[in-house]
């Protein structure tokens, strides 16, 4: 699939959601991202992944969360069924070689990460229009001395999906979907030198005004909604941890 910017290619891999070419022009400044050095885009993508690890999944200016909804027996029943289907469908991927054989691809396998995303891009495309709990976009693994340990999965939806529709996929009273927002890309021409403590998905700049003042290019939201589920955990709090 053709993507319009190098950043989109790297970040789409990181986000486990293939970006549509027609969506890119709607992102302010996205076409100027072509000038970013590949090493910079890789570092920024790694920052996104690190921000999605369990220990970093908290409120900050670069993460937007769905509003929690009132709990109900029906929502909890639905959530339990999703977890059951997911657990059964990914059990075989405890052998990570089976995941690779079925088309899941590891993002940045040679760079240390708290959690690795094995992504099936066909499933990601399917998730743009429908939800199948047995076909998560990404599998989540921790690195071990002899391979990878399966710990969970990630579902995705487009950035245009409403909270009502997200709730129909995975109840918002039980889980909270998140999106990566308020990203300031470094100014053009900085090569490998931009200060990534200021720019990118973990940088201190998080408003369009501040980004413009710094000479950067502001993206209101990159890619779609995501939710992590850890179906092998023993309590609902850990199964839907964020």
Model-derived regions: residue spans:
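Bacterial N-terminal signal peptides that target proteins for export
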Residues: 1-8
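Bacterial N-terminal signal peptides
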Residues: 8-16
């Amino acid at each position: 699939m053709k993507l319009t910017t190098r950043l989109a290619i790297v970040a789409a891999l990181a986000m486990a959601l293939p970006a549509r070419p027609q969506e890119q022009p709607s992102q302010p400044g996205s076409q100027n991202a072509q000038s970013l050095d590949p090493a910079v885009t890789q570092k920024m993508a790694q920052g996104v992944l690190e921000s999605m690890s369990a220990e970093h999944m908290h409120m900050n200016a670069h993460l937007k969360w769905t509003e929690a909804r009132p709990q109900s027996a029906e929502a909890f029943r639905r959530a339990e069924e999703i977890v059951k289907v997911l657990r059964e469908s990914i059990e075989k991927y405890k052998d990570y070689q089976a995941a690779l054989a079925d088309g899941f691809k590891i993002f940045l396998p040679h760079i240390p990460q708290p959690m690795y995303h094995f992504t099936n891009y066909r499933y990601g495309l399917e998730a743009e229009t429908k939800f199948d709990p047995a076909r998560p976009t990404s599998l989540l693994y921790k690195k071990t001395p002899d391979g990878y340990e399966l710990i969970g999965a990630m579902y995705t939806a487009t950035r245009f999906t409403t909270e009502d529709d997200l709730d129909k996929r995975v109840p918002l009273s039980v889980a909270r979907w998140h999106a990566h927002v308020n990203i300031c890309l470094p100014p053009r021409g900085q090569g490998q030198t931009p200060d990534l403590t200021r720019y990118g998905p973990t940088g201190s700049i998080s408003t369009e005004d501040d980004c413009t003042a710094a000479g950067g290019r502001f993206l209101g939201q990159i890619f779609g909604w995501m939710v992590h589920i850890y179906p092998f955990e023993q309590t609902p709090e850990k199964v839907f941890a964020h």
